[in-house]
């Protein structure tokens, strides 16, 4: 008939709906391992291809990494006789150092270039196990974390020249620094990684606040010790350990931390307006939360149909009532005298043994 779905279309619609349920999206462990193997293989393949391409363009990448050192004045760079005053050559002192430097630069660049592929594979493997709101929040936090890491790495690259100039300026009096290319590359790599990860700390604080683990009031009460610990952290983790690099890392972290406090304060106001505060939010950190078992919902009582009920052993029918069809009085009981109740004919009464006592007399 027109307007009605055909059986094939109806079955296809049902199958499409069933594939979207949680039960049908579950897979055995072997399927998960097989999917993980395939996604890891794709990520490694993308990394290998990016590594080959980056190895070809390694001289340009190395010139970009060497630019902060080349921006220093000639008085702070080692320029032996026969080289121009504006030369910024880095040196290596081992047989395999030149190849190691090129390989290290290619691998670092390959990780960055292939990051969209392996991040997508990681996201596709984790996403099926998340709910819709968890996917939304996780996607937001992943995007923000990538932006913060890239911002920290760029900020570290911009401050490399000033930090190097300050450190190499302590030479003089016949002391000239001859930079090893391998050590210089390790220094740049450590600075980019430390600044990028340090810029993620405010995001971690904001996640703890949104999860309800810590409130903004608690964080504000600890503000002075937290700022002090931030600068101590900046002084310890920076490879150069000079005051400029410490301030270059500590001040942005404090600024981002204040931004995280503002976002947490707005979240606390939203939660308080909705009335979603925890009943244990006012408890002290050392105080145990009470266990209340009175709020547990009562268990529903088991019910049975009226036709399947029968008198329990040792009881008799109420006055004026009769046994239901197909039932009999329990052994050892009888209907009360004068109640007018009787067992219907053919109701299937249970046989009475000779030793059973009956109300009308004993059967011998």
Curated annotation (Swiss-Prot):
Polar residues bias (residue ranges): 324-344
Subcellular location: Cell membrane
Disulphide linkage map: none
Transmembrane segments: 42-62, 107-127, 139-159, 160-180, 194-214, 225-245, 246-266
Keyword Ribosomal protein: no
Low complexity: bias regions: 301-320
Role played: Part of the twin-arginine translocation (Tat) system that transports large folded proteins containing a characteristic twin-arginine motif in their signal peptide across membranes. Together with TatB, TatC is part of a receptor directly interacting with Tat signal peptides.
Protein known as: Sec-independent protein translocase protein TatC
Taxonomic placement: Bacteria, Bacillati, Actinomycetota, Actinomycetes, Frankiales
Gene: tatC
